[in-house]
Curated annotation (Swiss-Prot):
Keywords: Cell inner membrane, Cell membrane, Ion transport, Membrane, Symport, Transmembrane, Transmembrane helix, Transport. It is found in: Cell inner membrane. Belongs to the NRAMP family. One of its GO terms (biological process) is iron ion transmembrane transport. The keyword 4Fe-4S does not apply. This is Divalent metal cation transporter MntH. It is a multi-pass membrane protein. Its main location: membrane. H(+)-stimulated, divalent metal cation uptake system. HAMAP family: NRAMP. The chain crosses the membrane at residues 19-39, 49-69, 94-114, 122-142, 155-175, 196-216, 240-260, 287-307, 323-343, 349-369, 393-413. GO terms for cellular component: plasma membrane. One of its GO terms (molecular function) is metal ion binding.
């Protein structure tokens, strides 16, 4: 009897540890469903139907592997990726890495902040500038949760992730994509035009986010007081699998909904979020348009919080400089207000920011692969040969795609 109680207590204790250790991947996963994803996925689905769904599938598989490597670097070493680069790279390289990582973080935050402002505009009928002000206030309130520790923030952001996923289950119900065509688009690679390659790079840049590669390792580096190293890694694998599967589903649903609703109804020119919202109303009804607006708002608010956190990790990790998180939020809001006041087309800014992000992926991945493939550093948590080779393949694909983009832009294709 006492033995069975002991076993039961042990099982409950393990469950508590597993639950306590889950959450960091949900924060990272928010970076994979930000407003930049909305913009690129809607444009890709409206323009090419289901033909680019395979890009989302493979980008999500890549993202899952990358985030697992980032998370286990923090668990195995107690340091994040930026700190390892600072400790092991020459000083000029460290400064270069810091500058490009800050630029990437700013481009990310610009897209996320403007996306949330558009969400407020669509749902509540305010101006874009008023939406930006509301976004600033809302993100301040969410960031203040950090004063209560990491877990409350994980729960709020995880809840917003699940809300966006639920919203897209509803959108799929409204749009009713053709399952056979959808599955074919997921399985058969196709890049029909040069513009499709540009959009594929945007989808890749929107799906694999450099700033959350840095962030995830910092979220797991201080979990040493919660369970053994093997327990932490086991929980992290489950955490990453669940969170990234949800993010992958949302991205697929975004593109499939755009394909079913816009591409096959003669609205393949839908290229911005306002237009998507206004076009959804007559095609699928007010409820579908409202759900779209709310999901954009939830994704924008949560992802801009994550972007602010990532920017702080990058600055502290690379140059040991710390500024209060709320002050950083004020500073990083400025480019968004400049874009809005200048009257630039916000969705175009979103899509171009995602292309810019794709150039930062390889720069984050190369040192991540080097560190997680080092047995002296990682011990028994070193990458397997399969994971290391898959990581190298991701780097090659990203560099090749970026090279094509540079040539295409230079030739104005």
């Amino acid at each position: 009897m006492s033995e069975s109680r002991t076993v039961e207590r042990s099982v409950r204790s393990n469950r508590k540890i597993k639950f306590a250790l889950m959450g960091p991947a949900f924060i990272a996963a928010i970076g994979y469903i930000d407003p930049g994803n909305f913009a690129t996925n809607i444009q890709a689905g409206a323009s090419y139907g289901y033909q680019l769904l395979w890009v989302v599938v493979w980008a999500n598989v890549m993202a899952m592997v990358i985030q697992l490597m980032s998370a286990k670097l923090g668990i195995a070493t107690g340091k994040n990726l930026a700190e390892h680069i600072r400790d092991r790279f020459p000083r000029p390289a460290v400064w270069f890495y810091w500058v490009q990582a800050e630029i990437i973080a700013m481009a990310t935050d610009l897209a996320e902040f403007i996306g949330a402002a558009i969400g407020f505009k669509l749902v509540f009928g305010v101006t874009l500038l008023q939406g930006a002000m509301l976004t600033g206030v809302a993100t301040f309130l969410i960031l203040m949760l950090q004063n209560r520790g990491q877990k409350p923030l994980e729960l709020v952001i995880g809840g917003l992730l699940l809300f966006v996923a639920a919203a897209y289950v509803i959108e799929l119900f409204f749009s009713q994509p053709k399952v056979v065509d959808l599955l074919q688009g997921m399985a058969v690679p196709s890049l029909p035009t040069a513009d499709a390659v540009l959009l594929a790079a945007g989808v890749l840049g929107a799906t694999i986010m450099p700033h959350v590669i840095y962030l995830h390792s910092s979220l797991t580096q201080n979990s040493g007081d919660q369970g053994s190293r093997s327990e932490r890694y086991s929980s992290t694998k489950l955490d990453v699998a669940i969170a990234m599967t949800i993010a992958g589903f949302v991205n697929l649903a975004m593109m499939a909904t755009a394909a079913a609703t816009f591409h096959f109804s003669g609205h393949s020119g839908v290229a911005d979020l306002d237009q998507a919202y206004l076009t959804l109303d007559p095609l699928l009804g007010k409820a579908a348009a409202l759900v779209f607006g709310l999901s954009l708002l939830a994704a924008g608010l949560s992802s801009t919080v994550v972007g602010t956190m990532a920017g702080q990790v990058v600055m502290q990790g690379f140059i040991h400089f710390h500024i209060p998180l709320l002050l950083r939020r004020v500073i990083t809001m400025l480019p968004s207000f400049i874009v809005i006041l200048a009257g630039w087309e916000p969705t175009r800014i979103l899509v171009m920011s995602q292309v810019l992000l794709s150039f930062g992926i390889a720069l984050a991945l190369i040192p991540l692969l080097a560190f997680t493939g080092n047995p002296g550093l990682m011990g028994d948590m070193v990458n397997s040969r399969l994971m290391q080779n898959f990581g190298r393949l991701i780097v090659v694909v990203v560099i090749a795609l970026n090279g094509y983009l540079l040539v295409a832009m230079a030739l104005n294709l």
